[in-house]
Amino acid sequence: MLRTRLNFFDACVGTAVEYVRDEWPDELADVRFEVAAVPSGEPGPLGVDRWRVSTRERRIVLYRLPIERLAHLHKDDEWHRRSFIESCVFRAVAELLGKDPWDIAPERYRHF
């Protein structure tokens, strides 16, 4: 099977979501995770969003193209790309739960 960037991104998000759901089952039981290509609307004051969190809707949307294209990795290989995508999932979950990303995934969170 041909492995595309889209498949790779979805797989990385899926494994990261599975990990955080295992770590925080009660807190994330009703949270919806979605992937979209880009955020709608104009960039905010901090630039292009990588994700959007809605606490009211219990929803996290990760934006694939900004995450992929605006990552400034010191080494552009599969491990670093996967780690960066996972870190975005962990930071979005931390934002939703009002916690620090290191608390969300102490064994896997890597700051980029």
Q: Residue spans of the language-model regions?
A:
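A conserved beta-strand element that flanks and buttresses the S-adenosyl-L-methionine
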Residues: 89
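Short, structured coil/loop segments at alpha-helix boundaries
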Residues: 6, 21, 77-78
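Active-site scaffold of zinc-dependent metalloenzymes
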Residues: 48-86, 96-112
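Auxiliary, metal-adjacent structural segments of Zn-dependent hydrolase domains
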Residues: 11-66
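Phosphate/ribose-recognition catalytic cores of enzymes acting on nucleotide-derived substrates
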Residues: 3, 7-10
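Walker B catalytic acidic pair
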Residues: 92
